[in-house]
């Protein structure tokens, strides 16, 4: 699997961080890694074939995690 880091988010909550990757092996999918206290809590994959997910949706997820809107 080939992953390219698109962006990193660190928000108002210093213990939270998120990284957004672009995956190019099969389709143009996006992967979001959600960290809390430097530990991977969750990984979300947005498959382009199942819906019209895009880079914007992945980045929005990362921002919402860092702002504390996702628990």
What annotation goes with each model-predicted range?
Residues 3, 7, 39-71:
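Mixed-charge, Lys/Arg-enriched low-complexity segments
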């Amino acid at each position: 699997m080939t992953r390219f880091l698109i962006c990193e988010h660190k928000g108002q909550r210093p213990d939270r961080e998120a990284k957004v990757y672009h995956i190019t092996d099969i389709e143009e999918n996006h992967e979001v890694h959600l960290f809390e206290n430097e530990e991977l809590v969750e990984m979300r994959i947005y498959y382009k074939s199942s819906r019209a997910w895009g880079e914007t949706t992945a980045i929005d997820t990362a921002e919402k995690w860092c702002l504390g809107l996702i628990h």
